[in-house]
Amino acid sequence: VPLTLEDFEREALPTLETYATIPCQSPGYDPEWATNGHLERATELLAEFALSRNFEAADVTIHRLEGRTPVLCVTIEATTDDEETDDDRGTVLLYGHLDKQPPLLPWSEGLHPYTPVRRGDRLFARGVADDGYSTFAALLAVEAMENDGIPHPRCVILIEASEESGSPDLEAYLDYLKPKLGQVELMICLDSGALTYDRLWVTTSLRGALHAQLTIDVLERGVHSGLASGVVPSSFRVLRQLLDRIENADTGEIVLEELHCEIPEAVHIAAAAVAAEFGDVAAADMPLVAGLRTLGDSDADRIVRRTWKPTLSVTGMDGIPHVDAAGNVLRPFTSVVLSLRLPPAVDAERAVKAVRDALTTDVPHGARVSADVQAADGWSSPELAPWLAEAVQVASQDAFGKPAGFTGEGGTIPFLASLGKRYPGVQFVATGVLGPHSNAHGIDEMLDLPTAVGVTNAVATILEAFTTRNDQ
């Protein structure tokens, strides 16, 4: 019996709304995370929810490694109707995260990042779609199977708390939890996107991410601009010169060859097919100002640009006063945070070296520059095994009434690339609820509740297919 919206409202929504009130920002945005306890409180809340579920055999454990964010691990042993053991069929690893992006105030009238608001079938709050719902979807999917007497495989639900910071704690936990994970045969990631809310969307690729914090110093202190300008180079101009080494300011194209990769012809074909059926999906959800011209030559080209091309965004800046407090001063420094998205096949370490060298070698005018550069690899899904390809279609039809969709995404989930390296040959289903107007990372983040229910039911269908699969 499929899970209904009423089931989700009764079983999951109260705890999800409590989670929404916790300002559990990812450690990269909250240097006091270890002392303020927000991530710990969110982890304990989700662990309590897991303990409240009715499984035949399950272990719920919060793991805490010194100096690292906590990880929630729920192991649910297989229920089978034959003589096979857990090891005979392998483990399904279900992944999500509980850390949140910064609140990014102000939100729209009547909404607040840490005050959940229900409007129709949509829940507004920071982190509910990215990725708070995932713990509930994974647990309820397995529980529904047990309630209906449907055999399921051994499942390990792994919920981390540093994903939004690039998952710096992930590798240590994967090493630590290796014995508990067992032989992972299928990985289901619930942190990805959806182009529409009418079907299950499966992610075929994700871009990598490079994060750089750059500071340019030209003076020990600010000086009257009438005295210093024309003599001392502006730190902002030096910044512009350095950024020109990375990006062509006229076109937005990245000029460092290390940040590019060959784009498979299949990507162009798939993008054209998605654009033909669904239109300009890459730009349709953007709150563009009137008259703005988007990049790209066509709907399909914009899909490719968003998923397989490198890009640069300046996401933060220091050293510049607010406009109403700006005096006639040549400022001593400029600091920026650079966010670069890397194509799925680009090597992150090679990209880090190229960007660091571009920012710190032969700096104009001999300005003092410091650059902290880190990156995470992108990911491209292996071809689905026949049984899984069929299961995904059945899951979408049963849960949504329409065939599954397949598309690349422009974001980053470091866990997928990491797991693919650790378990060669593992099968992946990356999906999620981040569809139109879900506003992940932005103001007014929203979870479409019927989609959360649909994804939950789809997961159950895929788990059932895993149990009965033929690995030919």
Residue ranges and their predicted role:
Residues 67, 98-100, 158-167, 190-195, ...:
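Acidic, glycine-rich active-site loops and adjacent beta-strand->loop/helix elements
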Residues 127-205, 471:
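Acidic/histidine-rich catalytic neighborhood of metal-dependent amide-processing enzymes
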Residues 203-217, 428-431, 435:
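Flexible glycine/proline-rich, aromatic-decorated loop/lid segments
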Residues 223-232, 324-327:
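A short glycine-threonine-serine/GTX helix/turn-capping micro-motif
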Residues 43, 196-197, 254-333, 344-357, ...:
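An extended, acidic, His-containing surface patch that forms the Zn2+-binding/catalytic region
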Residues 52, 83-159, 454:
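Active-site metal-coordination/substrate-binding segment of hydrolases
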Residues 172, 229-250:
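A short core secondary-structure module
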